[in-house]
């Protein structure tokens, strides 16, 4: 198959493996892996892709690959990753693979300088190139830009964000202190907002949108950081292998002895908020020695430090203090930050126990007294007793007649007191983080800003064994960002192509709007259902979950936990969780604490206490919040509720509005493995990331896409000031055309739309050259345009003169041709009218010539000479009379023949009489010769008659064929008229089927992603997935295939499991008519599927293989024939032998040959419904001969009805006409060789040739 060319086929762990096609199945291909010769496996045909011939080759832009598909995309990334080339383009989108180690000099200052002002594609792929492109787009287009850095947790988003910021400030900063502050703000934000998770050692547990603002001179003037959704639950509890926020550990590891004593710090295992997770520090050999022993936990002393090339708690503490100083924080403010952090730690050590009294409340444990003192008096500025009371009781106000009445203190149970303590800790830390962000923003203020470049770094799609409200919000955010990506890159791009008339093929992608509606829809969305639950007097997580399931019981995106592919999730009760099918896969959320985590308000006594702190810094932390939420709190007197979910939704919508108002660049970060180790490439999970991030859809779009564009007027206005008057009068479109021609651009690299010019992927340098607004550069380009216009106009004059001469010659040639045609037609008409008389005169004239021989015989006679002479004379008179009659009257062929026969008879009688008179041998010999000549004449006459009859028979057959075609055409029209009456119903049914098939395909695609995500969770959590989930989704059948298999079940023969070779052998050897018909049908159906696969996966910039003329294939696509059962089709055709001939021109020559000099002919011989022999005749190449069996892959795979040849006027020819051409081109020998080598399939043609050879 495919001449042994390699293909990519699915592999469970590597994503794809290379192999060869060895057989074609009903809807799958049999693949033999190259590294496992002799072993084969089945792969769905739409999951098999052609491979590049050079497996070690890599390209910087995946759009440069010969084959553009997800397998070659994955392989190219893998090859580059193995060479430490972690960046790759897909058009203007950057794919960044996390290397998990430091690559030397890749981010050095020298590297930054090398990318400044360089067009995308002129330098190797890099995050700096995207940053520079965003800056140049902002400068040229006068439009703010955004860079969206996305990817899973641990994929490298935070690091790439830092590199973008560093590049912009170093390259285009003013050289002042503000540039350093923007860069130095990152360590501070990371310390308070990043933490170690199981999938990322430096995971951002909040989202941020960093704006770098520029003035009118495109210099950095300031910045602004917006933050979203800090993960507050991490403050109180973490997973076993996870840590709290970095600041806690860095403070314990790196604080000086003075600070440690003032803040009463010790090792992490002594604090409740740290000791339930990992208590080890990040450190290297040097810093490990600098950390004092009393600051190390037992776990650290036993297992050693955590290792990460980018993290070091002791060193990072020092770097954080340096960053604080650079952004303007003095020692007092720095100590305030540390004091609040330590206060949160000590707050977590306050513990409770049941009270001995009957009140049902609780008291502080004795061992918590010191923690209470440290936290209240020394760190947070609170009264110990007030804090104790506020943590163990809750203040309620009775109401009477709508007015507030008596204050009642309600004792809290131990669990409630623990929740109150944790809520206070989360609130304090959250306000502290808000303060850090505000101080960061204050350190780089700006008065005026012309434009900005925003860099979005937000937590990637998260999926753990246990997922809660935080993961729900993060994944909701990622759904919205994926939709923005779909809109900006796929939807808006395709709408623009369609609007501009570029003719780019449509690319389908998964629309996740239904998932977003499920979460945020008004009243019925999960967020609104959760808010409604929070407003109830006694809200519960179980009631909220049940309400969600009830309102969306038939929603495709929402499911119950027991349908999960992971066994651990199937144990979750109906009212304790739900599954949402996200764009990246299904995630099971445990709804315990959803209600609690959605409420951002403290109960009244704690809120009042913290707002009235004696510490000025603490009061300032809560003052801004108090002012902002004043109205909310007044309402909260009753409900005490501030919705976290809806607050986040509002922030997210504002962010997306900002993104939509800017130009967008995308960096897709990829996590190469789950172990976070270097040089380890897990193909399957990387492929899943590429598919979920839309890279495969982008690759499909970019096969014919144009990522760069500019409007004609925009380009024209840029050059207008530099144009002389004669050029200024040019139409903008014409000016752009002249500009591109002057630059010598290849027409393949760009395309003109209605209002814009578009550039192919990889042509950003050419685009930037045109859009460069440097005055000297503009003047140079204008000079080139002027030169090109002069040359083009002179060439146009030359071409016009040549065209006029050609036109004159063509008119003269056509006039001569018309005269020649008229002469020929008149000659033919005249010949048809007078040919019987001319033929008669020729025959009678021949008879007259024989009279001389008669006279010679008579003159030699001795007796009866006079009598014989008279008879000869009479015969001559009769002949002359007949000749005169033929010339003077319009006699028919029959009349002439009758009188001619009479003369022949008379001459025969006369000859007989002469024979009697002539006795001598000499005379007898001469008479014998005359007899022979007459016999020859008779035979010639008979042959002429036979030829004439044959011509008449052929004319009759052609007339019958034409009449039959007209009859078939009339019957077809009648059928069409009948079909039109039910067409509306049929189309509606087909539309429903297509919609159902599309929905089913979306379900299958979503299930595939769900399974892949479950596998990745299973790998990371050492969990087993269900047997049902283990079933290979690659062999799940689509609706069309299921329908085919269902139909096959009703047939006599089930051929779905037969191999391609078995079908072929059965066709060649079987005598069972029904089996033969079924095998032929299945054989050609598989051929169609295989050729469709080849056409879809052809090389870039290559024409589709033509096994039949375009008119035939187009007809088959536009008019799908009704599929008759194979047996019925064979009977209806009755193995008729039909022959066809139609003009044929290769698509590559279609527009290069206006004179049709390369037009050839396509001949086909159909044996019943299927083709048996095929010929292509071209004027500039040898004839192409094909026979069924030997050349199935190159022959037309359509049946006769599908080709529409029987409906083409003049297409059908006589068998003799086909056989003459076939024999002349060496077809007999070709077919004989195929028969002798047992490659030809038994057909009418093979049987006839074998009989002829016998």
UniProtKB/Swiss-Prot annotation:
Membrane topology: Peripheral membrane protein
Region (SAH): 918-985
Domain Myosin motor: 57-772
Molecular-function annotations in GO: actin filament binding; ADP binding; ATP binding; calmodulin binding; cytoskeletal motor activity; microfilament motor activity
Tissues in which the protein is found: Expressed in all tissues examined including kidney cortex, intestinal mucosa, liver, lung, heart, jowl muscle, brain cortex and medulla, and in the epithelial cell line, LLC-PK1 (at protein level). In the kidney, located to the brush border of adult kidney proximal tubule cells.
GO biological process, one term: actin filament-based movement
SMART domains: MYSc
Region annotation (Actin-binding) ranges: 666-673
Entry GO terms, CC: actin cytoskeleton; actin filament; cell cortex; clathrin-coated vesicle; cytoplasm; cytoplasmic vesicle; cytosol; filamentous actin
Protein name according to UniProt: Unconventional myosin-VI
Binding site for ATP: 151-158
Residues of the IQ domain: 814-843
Species of origin: Sus scrofa (Pig)
First-listed, main subcellular location of the protein, grouped into a coarse class: Golgi
Sequence similarity: Belongs to the TRAFAC class myosin-kinesin ATPase superfamily. Myosin family.
PROSITE patterns tied to this protein: MYOSIN_MOTOR, SH3_LIKE
Record remark: domains: Divided into three regions: a N-terminal motor (head) domain, followed by a neck domain consisting of a calmodulin-binding linker domain and a single IQ motif, and a C-terminal tail region with a three-helix bundle region, a SAH domain and a unique globular domain required for interaction with other proteins such as cargo-binding. The SAH (single alpha-helix) region is characterized by a high content of charged residues which are predicted to stabilize the alpha-helical structure by ionic bonds. Its contribution to the mechanism conferring the myosin movement on actin filaments is debated.
Modified residues (Phosphoserine): 267, 605, 1026
Subcellular localization: Golgi apparatus, trans-Golgi network membrane; Golgi apparatus; Nucleus; Cytoplasm, Perinuclear region
Keyword Transmembrane helix part of the UniProt annotation: no
Modification(s) after translation: Phosphorylation in the motor domain, induced by EGF, results in translocation of MYO6 from the cell surface to membrane ruffles and affects F-actin dynamics. Phosphorylated in vitro by p21-activated kinase (PAK).
Interaction with TOM1: annotated span: 1117-1245
Residue span of region Required for binding calmodulin: 783-811
Region: Interaction with OPTN, residue numbers: 1085-1087
Region (Disordered): 935-956, 1096-1117
């Amino acid at each position: 198959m495919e001449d042994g060319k390699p293909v990519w086929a699915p592999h469970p762990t590597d994503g794809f493996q290379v192999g060869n096609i060895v057989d074609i199945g009903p809807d799958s291909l049999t693949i033999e892996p190259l590294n496992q010769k002799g072993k084969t496996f089945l792969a769905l045909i739409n999951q098999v892709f052609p491979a590049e011939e050079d497996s070690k080759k890599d390209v910087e832009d995946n759009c440069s690959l010969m084959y553009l598909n997800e397998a070659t995309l994955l392989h190219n990334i893998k090859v580059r990753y193995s060479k430490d080339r972690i960046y790759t383009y897909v058009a203007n989108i950057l794919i960044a693979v996390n290397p998990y180690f430091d690559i030397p000099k890749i981010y050095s200052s020298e590297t930054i300088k090398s990318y400044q002002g360089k067009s995308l594609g002129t330098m190797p792929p890099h995050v700096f190139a995207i940053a520079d492109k965003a800056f140049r787009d902002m400068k040229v287009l006068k439009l703010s830009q955004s860079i969206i850095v996305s990817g899973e947790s641990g994929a490298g988003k935070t690091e790439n964000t830092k590199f973008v910021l560093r590049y912009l400030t170093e390259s285009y900063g003013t050289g002042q202190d503000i540039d350093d502050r923007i860069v130095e703000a990152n360590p501070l934000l990371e310390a308070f907002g990043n933490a170690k998770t199981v999938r990322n050692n430096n995971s951002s547990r909040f989202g941020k949108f960093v704006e770098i603002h520029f003035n009118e001179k495109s210099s950095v003037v300031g910045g602004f950081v917006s933050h979203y959704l800090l993960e507050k639950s991490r403050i109180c509890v973490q997973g076993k292998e996870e840590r709290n926020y970095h600041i806690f550990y860095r403070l314990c590891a790196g604080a000086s002895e003075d600070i440690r004593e003032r803040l009463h710090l010790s090792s992490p295992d002594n604090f409740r908020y740290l000791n339930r997770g990992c208590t080890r520090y990040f450190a290297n050999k040097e810093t490990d020695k600098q950390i004092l022993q009393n600051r190390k936990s037992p776990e650290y002393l036993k297992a050693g430090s955590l290792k990460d090339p980018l993290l070091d708690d002791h060193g990072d503490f020092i770097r954080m203090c340096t960053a604080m100083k650079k952004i303007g924080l003095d020692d007092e403010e720095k100590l305030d930050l540390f004091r609040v952090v330590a206060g949160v730690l000590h707050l977590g050590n306050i513990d409770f126990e049941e009270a001995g009294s009957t009140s049902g409340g609780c008291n502080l444990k004795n061992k918590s007294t010191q923690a209470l003192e440290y936290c209240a008096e020394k760190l947070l500025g609170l009264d110990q007793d007030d804090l104790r009371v506020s943590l163990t009781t809750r203040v309620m106000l009775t109401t009477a007649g709508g007015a507030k009445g008596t204050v009642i203190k309600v004792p809290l149970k131990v669990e409630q007191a623990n929740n109150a303590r944790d809520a206070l800790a989360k609130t304090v830390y959250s306000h502290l983080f808000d303060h850090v962000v505000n101080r960061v923003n204050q350190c780089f203020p700006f008065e005026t800003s012309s434009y900005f470049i925003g860099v979005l770094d937000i937590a990637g799609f998260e999926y753990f064994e246990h997922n809660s409200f935080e993961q729900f919000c993060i994944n909701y955010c990622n759904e919205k960002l994926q939709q923005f990506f779909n809109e900006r890159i796929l939807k808006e791009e395709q709408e623009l192509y369609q609007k501009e008339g570029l003719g780019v093929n449509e690319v389908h992608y998964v629309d996740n709007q239904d998932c977003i509606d499920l979460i945020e829809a008004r009243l019925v969305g999960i967020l609104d259902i959760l808010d409604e639950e929070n407003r109830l007097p006694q809200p519960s997580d179980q009631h909220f979950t049940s309400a969600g399931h009830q309102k969306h019981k038939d929603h495709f995106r929402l499911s119950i936990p027991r349908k999960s592919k992971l066994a651990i999730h199937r144990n979750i009760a109906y009212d304790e969780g739900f599954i949402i099918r996200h764009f990246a896969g299904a995630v099971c959320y445990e709804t315990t604490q959803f209600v609690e985590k959605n409420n951002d308000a403290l109960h009244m006594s704690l809120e009042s206490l913290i707002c009235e702190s004696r510490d000025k810094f603490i009061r300032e932390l809560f003052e801004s919040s108090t002012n902002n939420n004043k109205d909310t709190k007044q309402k909260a007197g009753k409900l005490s509720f501030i919705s976290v979910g809806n607050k986040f939704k509002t922030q997210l919508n504002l962010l997306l509005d900002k993104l939509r108002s800017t130009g967008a660049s995308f960096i897709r970060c990829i996590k190469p493995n789950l172990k976070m180790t270097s040089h380890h490439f897990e193909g399957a999970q990387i492929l899943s990331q590429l598919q979920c991030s839309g890279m495969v859809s982008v690759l499909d779009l970019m096969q014919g896409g144009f990522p760069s564009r500019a409007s004609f007027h925009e380009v024209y206005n840029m050059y207008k000031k530099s144009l002389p008057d004669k050029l200024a009068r040019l139409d903008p479109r014409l000016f752009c055309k002249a500009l591109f021609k002057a630059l010598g651009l290849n027409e393949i690299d760009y395309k003109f739309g209605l209002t814009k010019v578009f550039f192919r992927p990889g042509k950003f340098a050419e685009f930037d050259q045109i859009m460069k607004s440097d005055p000297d550069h503009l003047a140079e380009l204008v000079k080139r345009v002027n030169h090109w216009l002069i040359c083009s106009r002179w060439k146009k004059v030359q071409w016009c003169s040549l065209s006029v001469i050609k036109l004159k010659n063509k008119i003269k040639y056509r006039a001569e041709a018309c005269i020649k045609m008229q002469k020929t037609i008149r000659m033919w008409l005249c010949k048809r009218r007078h040919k019987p008389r001319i033929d008669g005169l020729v025959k009678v004239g021949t008879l007259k010539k024989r009279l001389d021989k008669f006279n010679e015989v008579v003159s030699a006679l001795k007796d009866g000479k006079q009598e014989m002479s008279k008879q000869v004379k009479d015969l001559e008179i009769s002949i002359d009379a007949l000749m005169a009659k033929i010339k003077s009257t319009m006699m028919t062929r029959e009349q002439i023949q009758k009188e001619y026969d009479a003369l022949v008879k008379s001459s025969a009688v006369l000859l007989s009489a002469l024979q009697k008179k002539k006795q001598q041998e000499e005379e007898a010999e001469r008479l014998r010769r005359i007899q022979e000549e007459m016999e020859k004449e008779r035979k010639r006459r008979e042959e002429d008659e036979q030829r004439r009859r044959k011509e008449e028979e052929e004319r009759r057959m052609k007339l019958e064929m034409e009449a039959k075609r007209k009859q078939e055409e009339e019957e077809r029209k009648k059928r069409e008229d009948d079909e039109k009456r039910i067409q509306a119903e049929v189309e509606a049914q087909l539309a429903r089927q297509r919609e159902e098939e599309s929905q089913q395909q979306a379900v299958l695609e979503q299930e595939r992603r769900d399974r892949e995500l479950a596998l990745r969770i299973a790998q990371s959590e050492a969990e087993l997935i269900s047997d049902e989930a283990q079933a290979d989704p690659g062999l799940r059948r689509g609706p069309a295939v299921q329908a085919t298999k269902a139909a096959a079940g009703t047939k006599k023969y089930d051929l779905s499991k037969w191999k391609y070779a078995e079908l072929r052998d059965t066709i060649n050897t079987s005598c069972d008519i029904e089996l033969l018909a079924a095998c032929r049908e299945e054989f050609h159906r598989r051929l169609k599927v295989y050729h469709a696969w080849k056409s879809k996966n052809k090389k870039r910039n290559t024409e589709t293989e033509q096994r039949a003329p375009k008119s035939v294939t187009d007809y088959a696509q536009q008019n799908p024939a009704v599929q008759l059962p194979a047996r019925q089709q064979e009977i209806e055709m009755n193995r008729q032998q039909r022959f066809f001939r139609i003009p044929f021109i290769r698509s590559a020559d279609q527009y290069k040959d206006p004179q049709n000099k390369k037009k050839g002919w396509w001949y086909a011989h159909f044996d019943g419904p299927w083709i048996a022999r095929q010929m292509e005749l071209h004027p500039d190449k040898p004839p192409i001969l094909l026979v069924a069996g030997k050349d199935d892959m190159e022959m037309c795979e359509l049946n006769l009805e599908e080709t529409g040849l029987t409906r083409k006027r003049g297409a059908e020819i006589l068998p003799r006409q086909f056989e003459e051409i076939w024999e002349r081109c060496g077809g007999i020998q070709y077919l004989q060789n195929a028969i002798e080598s047992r490659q030809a399939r038994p057909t009418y043609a093979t049987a006839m040739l074998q009989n002829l050879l016998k």
